[in-house]
């Protein structure tokens, strides 16, 4: 496209959430509280998983990276939004805008891949519990996690390198509170066809592709849970994946509503965007902390004066996820001797000896 006599702009102007100073002050306090809560929740979860050997399992390795991604995603969006709520001049350079777009792509793409990897982990734990330790070996879950980061960075690099070549002329007002690629493309006066193709591929591969992987995993999981005859068995099996299922629903639900809305700056579009970029990172760690029994158990243990001791002699361990006084088809009960633990030892270490225990 010929640029003619258009002057090239070097900064963008954000309209933000509101022009009313009183509303902006109220929103500043609200979003600052949410941001601080997000940081504290995710840091606490990270430190807990790191410090406690009982939580050194594939699921918690995924969860630690998910918490770190949520922490980064929130830190990319919220600080600049808080600055704009207090500032009269809501501008940012083109380079700064593209830097924010890059890290949004990295964190959002990595989170989508991590959620699909966690879905596969839950699929292996529920559908093939006897082989879980062999399926989710250290090499596999390390590859899944670091592969998620690699795909996130690759996706961001491709999209931003194409955006660097775009020229922005005259129109520089963004009807939003943050900088995202769909908001920038209409402002360009150069050819954006390649950027549109790259954005479409990113949406299909990272968004739709990972969603299909999660959907297929949970189709098998639900089928397996429904095949369990006892109500308590079904309840225990479902509880192992309820936190992840809630996080997936929140992520894809809010993301779908956000990206289906036009970038017009309408109140309803801004509400869905705030839900996706500000509220969801805060809720993820809260969901896992409240729904996961081991995380709640570790918090309780830290408040106790001592850890409970195992009874001496031969203890018998029954896999808790499916059986309760009866045998389920395809999931036979196994009784496994547990080695007595010394006082003060982690009670979870005894459970690692049981390969049939649901992770």
Swiss-Prot record:
Described purpose of this protein according to its UniProt entry: Odorant receptor.
Q: Where in the cell is it found?
A: Cell membrane
Point out the coiled-coil segments of this chain: none
- Which named protein is this? Olfactory receptor 8S1
Q: Which gene encodes it?
A: OR8S1
Q: Which GO terms describe its molecular function?
A: G protein-coupled receptor activity; olfactory receptor activity
Q: Which residues cross the membrane?
A: 26-46, 55-75, 100-120, 140-160, 198-217, 238-258, 270-290
**Chief localization class?**
membrane
The UniProt similarity line reads: Belongs to the G-protein coupled receptor 1 family.
**Which Pfam family, giving just one, matches this sequence?**
7tm_4
**Where does it sit, as one GO cellular component term?**
plasma membrane
Q: Which organism is it from?
A: Homo sapiens (Human)
Q: Which UniProt keywords apply?
A: Cell membrane, Disulfide bond, G-protein coupled receptor, Glycoprotein, Membrane, Olfaction, Receptor, Sensory transduction, Transducer, Transmembrane, Transmembrane helix
Q: Which residues lie on this side of the membrane: Extracellular?
A: 1-25, 76-99, 161-197, 259-269
Residues bearing glycans: 5
Task: Pull the Cytoplasmic topological domain ranges from the record.
Answer: 47-54, 121-139, 218-237, 291-359
Q: Which InterPro entries match?
A: GPCR_Rhodpsn, GPCR_Rhodpsn_7TM, Olfact_rcpt
Q: Which cysteines are joined by disulfide bonds?
A: 97-189
Q: Which GO terms describe its biological process?
A: signal transduction
Topology of this chain in the membrane? Multi-pass membrane protein
What are the boundaries of the region Disordered?
301-338
